[in-house]
Amino acid sequence: MPEHDPHQENRTVSSVRLEDDAAEASLRPQSLAEFIGQRASRENLSIFIQAAKARGEAMDHVLLHGPPGLGKTTLAQIVSRELGVGFRATSGPVIQRAGDLAAILTNLQPRDVLFIDEIHRLQPAIEEVLYPAMEDFQLDLIIGEGPAARSVRIDLAPFTLVAATTRAGLLATPLRDRFGIPLRLIFYTASELELIVSRGAEKLGFDLSREGAAEIARRSRGTPRIAGRLLRRVRDFAMVQGVSPVDRSTADAALQRLEVDSLGLDAMDRRYLHRIAVHHAGGPVGVETLAAALAEARDTLEDVIEPYLIQEGLILRTSRGRMLGEAGWRHLGLVPPPSAAGGQPDMLTLLHRDGSADE
């Protein structure tokens, strides 16, 4: 997950966790049976959990990676609940010293689950401490300084590390290789999100029609966290206006007032697309150039804004930079310039080149 960015605080469709999302805990599934979507990952986890319980051993370490808001933290909590063991949570940026990690690890009970969010932001020196802990359930610590320093090995209770990251490529290879169960979470389908929205409406205690749920799901960018946030905002509008049940037109009106369009894009997304279309003739343009022009951090563009735009074909990520896709031109209601319209073979060539745009 990218570092805190104040520009994201007012984005209703931001996939990063906001203060308002504290209410989402009440909407979270409590078991794998309740969990909607991520079918392959969910079914595999169920098998690994059952096998670990049958053997009476700690489950192998799990790496959950994918865009923010897809349920990594929720799945980690479900794993501990299904295993019937304790759950400890922390995050990469919080662990500043090897001693911090040692204190957490030595306090774990046998087979407990330790969840580390944003594990790609762990300092290299702390990663080194984690290697023997994951592989041999032992800690190697240096006690003292100078000539009096000595190495001490501490045995740990067997535990399961469940780690989450939005940037799996930033993990050091030795760390990544120590996860026996790597699972990639993908964007949710509209039908899966419709089920999530309908269930959320029941838990929040308001009447939402199937068409209303479908409208919210369609604009949720394939992300349950955004679906829950839009659901709560639609509920607010409906409550103040005294509308019940909430149908498609009510949901549409509320989302239009939030400036969330039919694809789930907000003003920030449209600024991004408009910048490429108008100022760069559809691209290619480097991400650093876009970040400077939009006054956003590069990480914010790559982790929060771009994944869904790429998924929907609105932009293309090539070795020379970002290009506006045909769907992007259509969504903006603009006609692509002749160079873009006639340059499709070149765009495909760019896409198949090795490497990615650094700028």
UniProtKB/Swiss-Prot annotation:
Gene Ontology cellular component annotations, sorted alphabetically: cytoplasm; Holliday junction resolvase complex
GO MF, any single term: four-way junction helicase activity
Residues involved in ATP binding: L27, R28, G69, K72, T73, T74, E135, D136, F137, R178, Y188, R225
Region of interest (Head domain (RuvB-H)), ranges: 262-359
Entry's Gene Ontology BP terms: DNA recombination; DNA repair
Catalysed reaction equations from the record: ATP + H2O = ADP + phosphate + H(+)
Binding site for DNA: R298, R317, R322
InterPro entries with a match to the protein in the record: AAA+_ATPase, AAA_lid_4, DNA_helicase_Holl-junc_RuvB, P-loop_NTPase, RuvB-like_N, RuvB_C, WH-like_DNA-bd_sf, WH_DNA-bd_sf
Broad class of the protein's primary localization: cytoplasm
Pfam families: AAA_lid_4 (PF17864), RuvB_C (PF05491), RuvB_N (PF05496)
Region of interest (Large ATPase domain (RuvB-L)), residue spans: 4-188
Biased composition (Basic and acidic residues): 1-10
Keywords assigned: ATP-binding, Cytoplasm, DNA damage, DNA recombination, DNA repair, DNA-binding, Hydrolase, Nucleotide-binding
Segments of this protein annotated with the region Disordered: 1-20
Localization per Swiss-Prot or TrEMBL: Cytoplasm
Region Small ATPAse domain (RuvB-S), annotated ranges: 189-259
EC number assigned by the record: 3.6.4.-
Residues reported to bind Mg(2+): T73
Assembly mode: Homohexamer. Forms an RuvA(8)-RuvB(12)-Holliday junction (HJ) complex. HJ DNA is sandwiched between 2 RuvA tetramers; dsDNA enters through RuvA and exits via RuvB. An RuvB hexamer assembles on each DNA strand where it exits the tetramer. Each RuvB hexamer is contacted by two RuvA subunits (via domain III) on 2 adjacent RuvB subunits; this complex drives branch migration. In the full resolvosome a probable DNA-RuvA(4)-RuvB(12)-RuvC(2) complex forms which resolves the HJ.
HAMAP family: DNA_HJ_migration_RuvB
Family: Belongs to the RuvB family.
Domains (record comment): Has 3 domains, the large (RuvB-L) and small ATPase (RuvB-S) domains and the C-terminal head (RuvB-H) domain. The head domain binds DNA, while the ATPase domains jointly bind ATP, ADP or are empty depending on the state of the subunit in the translocation cycle. During a single DNA translocation step the structure of each domain remains the same, but their relative positions change.
Role noted for this protein: The RuvA-RuvB-RuvC complex processes Holliday junction (HJ) DNA during genetic recombination and DNA repair, while the RuvA-RuvB complex plays an important role in the rescue of blocked DNA replication forks via replication fork reversal (RFR). RuvA specifically binds to HJ cruciform DNA, conferring on it an open structure. The RuvB hexamer acts as an ATP-dependent pump, pulling dsDNA into and through the RuvAB complex. RuvB forms 2 homohexamers on either side of HJ DNA bound by 1 or 2 RuvA tetramers; 4 subunits per hexamer contact DNA at a time.
The name this protein goes by in its record: Holliday junction branch migration complex subunit RuvB
Organism for this UniProt entry: Granulibacter bethesdensis (strain ATCC BAA-1260 / CGDNIH1)
Higher taxonomy: Bacteria, Pseudomonadati, Pseudomonadota, Alphaproteobacteria, Acetobacterales
Designated gene of the protein: ruvB
